Amino acid sequence: MSQTEQAVREDGVIRSVSGPVVTARGLDARMNDVVYVGDEGLMGEVIEIEDNVTTVQVYEETSGIGPDEPVRNTGEPLSVDLGPGLLDTIYDGVQRPLDILEDKMGSPYLDRGVDAPGIELDTEWEFEPTVSEGDTVESGDEVGIVEETVTIDHKVLVPPDYEGGEVTTVKSGEFTVEETVVELSSGESVQMRQEWPVREPRPTVEKKTPREPLVSGQRILDGLFPIAKGGTAAIPGPFGSGKTVTQHQLAKYADADIIIYVGCGERGNEMTEVIDDFPELEDPSTGNPLMARTSLIANTSNMPVAARESCVYTGITIAEFYRDMGYDVALMADSTSRWAEAMREISSRLEEMPGEEGYPAYLAARLAQFYERAGYFENVNGTEGSVSAIGAVSPPGGDFSEPVTQNTLRIVKTFWALDADLAERRHFPSINWDESYSLYKEQLDPWFQENVEDDWPEERQWAVDVLDEESELQEIVQLVGKDALPDDQQLTLEVARYLRESYLQQNAFHPVDTYCSPEKTYLTVTAIHQFNDEAFEALDAGVPVDEIISIDAAPRLNRIGVQDDYEEYIATLKEDIATQLQELY
């Protein structure tokens, strides 16, 4: 919402300033109204009203403003601009396009109070109508298509708060987002641009049970702990365990139609990496640039704290907008802990009663409000779309018992626990298979059986059983050593090692291994399973375990991930393993 566009009223003055929290007196405002604070017009939002005193959280640095400066009310809630131009763009936490602000300022250093619309108002888009005069449309119905990027067709919808009616006028050609393209008998006119309050979920008909996986291209996620399209997942882990790289991998290779990446309070150089890498990378499903399906929201750790609180809502509102068009959207929030810390700071400045570890008592409610906006929905126009929410959590010291992790755990259905010990051993992605879980496995099995292989659930369960047995045996090994174990248990440890090194480990920086299709994931585990079965046959025939594990073909299991022509490689490898083991007896 641009300051220049709003009919702002100078109807209040600053009473006090405490960091990002400003109190004003004489301000005629409602909860969540957007206001402009001080002579420079810093954007803020009303968060508390008591008698004649209004409390505002300011989304910019407040140094230098003081008492009796004006506070102007817009009378509108914090909203985002929705329309063509959202993709291939980078925003700050309140949807100001950073590249446009840089051009406006002539400098990468932005002044306070500078503003710009969320989508460019002067750009003309080719509008192709999908309705004719005389057709009847309701709220949410599609009236036309705009080619937003080479990957995504932007569907122009009747806004959800419109009554609808008979189409009286339809235009075709190039228009700006504010020009009317369709007129209705109700007197309403449809433009390509909509506004929507960020804290209000967009309406749907029904939330449905997800049945299709969000294929990530990461073997451990797709194979052992899958997330559904419309699912929720948390990635908690200590510093340096790989949360951000895992989020980047999901943003690059997840088979969603649209990616919304929210950098919430994390390091600036990590967002820089995204901005540098994504334009050069190809979307594996279309071959087009990744940025053509991506919108970035950057609110790094050196940006104002209050804007962290809004950036997550900005991201999920944009995600819901594309969901209404029938697209599958994946939202990455990195990290929800920084969002919670922003809530804690503002709560403490408001002198609210603190909850556990100083977080506000409403922490669980806010987290639930965010994650519950994810899901697989039937939209009001009859299409189906999904929003998958994947939030990184940064518990101090890797302590999963802290409030943000525990409250997130109660809400999400997929838990990918990152492990500092695995990261120190250079096992990446460092997802601990003993602590992680997915509650979507059973409902996604029919999809994997239909689209990959019938015995997908059995192969997954076999891998889980071997890894569980290894965890139990490791405790004995640490006490008495590996050589003291019986031969069959030594062989189990060797099979588990191949599972860890060739199935669970994956090199995010290798051009081939960075992405693994479900078919390749399945064939990898079947190759290790065959080695297991043939090796135990040889062991039963009296072959010493040392000879079994030292065959030449076995180490080639660790090279499956980097093979481009993996089907032929795995078929040859299976034959060689069988031949070499049978030669031993």
Curated annotation (Swiss-Prot):
Keyword ATP-binding: yes
EC number: 7.1.2.2
Keywords: ATP synthesis, ATP-binding, Cell membrane, Hydrogen ion transport, Ion transport, Membrane, Nucleotide-binding, Translocase, Transport
Residues binding ATP, per UniProt: 237-244
Comp. bias regions, Basic and acidic residues: 196-211
Family classification: Belongs to the ATPase alpha/beta chains family.
Record protein name field: A-type ATP synthase subunit A
Gene source species: Haloquadratum walsbyi (strain DSM 16790 / HBSQ001)
Gene for this chain: atpA
